[in-house]
């Protein structure tokens, strides 16, 4: 859960600004370069990205641990490594390996939606009125691009939790995926059934949260329910 959460946050914090930049400055060399890098990011599987990250940042540079979770802090039923330095360092590489694919998807989706919104009449009217460009891009245009991003992020978050098996195996991360692999190895049926129930509950909860987020982002949906 912790690994998927950090990967999702990274994908949004990096992917959305990159999508806006490539849409605003389309045709520029750096925009085309980001587009090319995004194709590579979509093409590479997560375990290859993980191995490359380990080789560069853990083995060659020695900046972060190559595997494990580091020190954790127990908060009731939840143990987290976000509150310790070694836990955050151990979280960096696997979360980046998971987030790279999501970053490219978010960037390309925001770029496509942003380019369509920038051709809208309300954007032209805002420019004619002299509204600052940053306000047009990040307050008005970007808000109209977030609906598909919310949907994709929620579905990918559930997929990260359910299918991050290979990444957890590469980094020896003691997560739900590793637990499921061990349960399959030893034919532990109660654990497998519990894992599937938890994943199903997560997907149902995410769908509900997406519907709520739609009403928050788009005021027209709130008005339609009145």
Task: Label every model-predicted segment.
Residues 36-68, 90, 97-103:
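Membrane-water interface segments at the C-terminal ends of transmembrane alpha-helices
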Residues 68-75:
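Membrane-interface interhelical connector segments
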């Amino acid at each position: 859960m912790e690994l998927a959460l950090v990967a999702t946050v990274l994908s949004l914090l990096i992917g959305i600004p990159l999508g806006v930049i490539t849409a605003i400055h389309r045709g520029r060399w750096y925009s085309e370069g980001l587009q090319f890098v995004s194709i590579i990011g979509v093409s590479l599987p997560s375990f290859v990205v993980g191995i490359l990250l380990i080789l560069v940042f853990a083995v060659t540079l020695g900046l972060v641990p190559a595997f494990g979770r580091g020190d954790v802090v127990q908060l009731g039923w939840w143990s987290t490594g976000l509150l310790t330095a070694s836990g955050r360092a151990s979280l960096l590489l696997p979360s980046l390996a998971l987030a790279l694919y999501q970053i490219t998807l978010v960037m390309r989706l925001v770029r496509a939606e942003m380019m369509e919104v920038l051709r809208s009449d309300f954007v032209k009217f805002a420019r004619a009125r002299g509204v600052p460009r940053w306000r047009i891009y990040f307050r008005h245009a970007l808000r109209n691009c977030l609906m598909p991003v919310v949907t994709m992020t929620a579905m990918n978050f559930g997929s990260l939790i359910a299918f991050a098996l290979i990444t957890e195996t590469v980094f020896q991360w003691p997560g739900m995926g590793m637990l499921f692999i061990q349960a399959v190895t030893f034919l532990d049926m109660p654990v497998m059934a519990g894992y599937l129930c938890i994943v199903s509950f997560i997907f149902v909860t995410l769908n509900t949260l997406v519907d709520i987020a739609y009403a928050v982002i788009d005021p027209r949906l709130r008005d339609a329910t009145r």
